[in-house]
């Protein structure tokens, strides 16, 4: 999110320098009838930060994970082997923010003097990460804390539909807020999560459900020039569905609900 905020800060700084300059001289009003046109089209380029919102099972740290749910590859310690392991606990689970990017096509319909309906089919690329800490206890009484990260690659096909409310235009600048919904499909969510070891299949990754439905809110600024309008906006997107697939596995056992969350800085050209 820090990188996205830096990009936003630079964009707002540029906007802050443009406004005083326009106020000090006679301004040519570009695209004066732009808002009166019924339809507008364009494209979007964006930087995003994807993450999860994790709701854990109550007292999950005290629950022993069954042996058939243990990871069987890259056994983390030489203090004792898997067969010498007495039990494993999931000690902690946290989510990481990861950067990505989005491209999309903009379709906008005028609903009224200050209202627009926008449809922006998009492709978003990133990954989500979960940090796990396992506590292993051997039959000999030794314990070992193992930390590792599970990365889930993500390619979202998104269909955001939102209502945009515009302020009154000031010279060649306008502000707006928007809100709406975003059905999305994760093309990478069904990636194979099994590994074959000595003829047996073992689960070795976290897999999420393919479909999600999100609510979105955001704010932005429109900048008009001679040939087109450029917008800079930020939005938060909150997944409404639980996307975890419970496969009786140590990576999913402590998770009661898992939801998508996204922060995005967008540049729109119409």
Predicted regions, residues:
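Structural signature of outer-membrane beta-barrel domains
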Residues: 48-52, 124-128, 182-188, 237-243, ...
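Outer-membrane beta-barrel channels and translocator barrels
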Residues: 36, 112-114, 168-172, 224-226, ...
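Residues on the lipid-exposed face of transmembrane beta-strands in outer-membrane beta-barrel proteins
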Residues: 43-47, 101-109, 121-123, 157-165, ...
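Short glycine/proline- and aromatic-enriched beta-strand/turn motifs that initiate or cap beta-hairpins
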Residues: 23-99, 270
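Predominantly the C-terminal beta-signal and adjacent terminal strand-loop region
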Residues: 210-215, 221-270
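Extracellular loop and loop/strand-boundary signature of outer-membrane beta-barrel proteins
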Residues: 28-30, 88-93, 143-150, 201-207, ...
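Outer-membrane beta-barrel translocator domains and adjoining extracellular loop/strand segments
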Residues: 54-60, 130-136, 188-197, 243-250
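Residues that define the transmembrane beta-barrel architecture of outer-membrane proteins
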Residues: 37-41, 97-101, 153-157, 173, ...
